[in-house]
Amino acid sequence: MRIEYLADRPEALPPLARWKHKEWGHFRPGDTVEKRQARLADTSNRDRIPLTVVALEGEEVLGSASLIEHDMETRMELTPWLAGVYVGEAFRRRGIGAELVRRIMSEAGKLKVPLLYLYTVHSERFYAALGWTFLERTSYLEQDVVIMTDKP
């Protein structure tokens, strides 16, 4: 397994957009796979935020994670964010998600980010095991979420 920049693997856009739309499309009523793909394409950078990295095995796309400026419209003062960590269902429980998170942390460190944020509905224990710290529990998009922080 290797992790590359989405900027270098544009062919990963369609499967990633489909997966992420299926997983999180309900958060944006009226959204489409095409709109999600366009937003994801906007993260095709290597040396600035926003950026996305892609996990691959051979040419097969396994998952991705992003470093973005804002991920919660209600908490615009918090920036930047680890976002969109997703591993395809067939590839889970192999440590790929953890490697994607570590890579984003490394990218944030290169960009001199002092503190990184994330929010999660179900994965607080996963991120805590990677060293992330609880910041607060709140409601966002009609769901209870936990905001966490970590220093790159």
Question: What do these predicted regions represent?
Answer:
Residues 68-79, 94:
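Helix-adjacent hinge/juxtasegments
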Residues 2-16:
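A short beta-loop-alpha structural element at the N-terminal edge
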Residues 25-54, 62:
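Active-site rim helix/loop that mediates acceptor-substrate recognition in acyltransferases
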Residues 52-54, 60-70, 81, 86:
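Conserved beta-strand in the GNAT
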Residues 108-120:
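Conserved GNAT acetyl-CoA-binding A-motif
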Residues 118-123, 133-152:
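C-terminal "cap" of GNAT-fold acetyltransferases
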Residues 16-24:
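Hydrophobic alpha-helical core bundles mediating ligand binding, dimerization, or RNAP-core interactions
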Residues 91, 95-103:
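Conserved acetyl-CoA pyrophosphate-binding loop and the N-cap/start of the following alpha-helix
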